[in-house]
Amino acid sequence: MNTSWHEPNQAYEESIRSFVDGVLQSPEFIASLERFVEPLVQPGRINSLAQTLIKMVVPGLPDFYQGTELWDLSLVDPDNRRPVDFALRADLVRRARAMPASEALSDWDSGLPKLWMTARLLALRREREADFSGQSKYQPLVAQGTHLGRVFAFRRGENLIAVVPRFTMTLGAEWGDTCLPLPGGVWRNCFTDTVVEREVRPGTLFEGFPVALLIREGA
């Protein structure tokens, strides 16, 4: 470690800034960086949705750092203290309230899918307080089949099931015989309104939105 928050090395930090400024003037470097990043973008966005769903459904209170309602590419302090465009977020929330998942997914670049999902989950937490209370315990669920390790799922209490994909960069669209057995009852995906029971195949579950939260019908 050549520099730190408590013991900064000004000369070293200035040399780093000069180096970064220099490479960013190179069209060849920019082109190679874009080629490197491009295949990471969509898997990264899906991971962001998965992490957000998990933190909003597991026991405890979800924490949101300012600005992370949309995609956030900042580093740790002080980089993550950039000004936040709250007017933009307020406008997107107003737009998102009435739109279906398909419309939210039509605007990936703005981060609308993440804000849309977050708004839905916050409303759900308000409507179904008992399902998110300390009495609703975490229970892991295990998938079956070829890609069982690429599904992360858990039950929250009796009425909620969260399901997200893992390792999506190398998965492609092929889930093969992978399925997730479900507890008894009829379950509705709160993002797409798809209704399932007994078991569900990830390829079907994630067809309308990249992650899923199932709610027991009639509960």
Regions found by a protein language model. Give the residues of each.
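Carbohydrate-interacting/catalytic domains
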Residues: 1-219
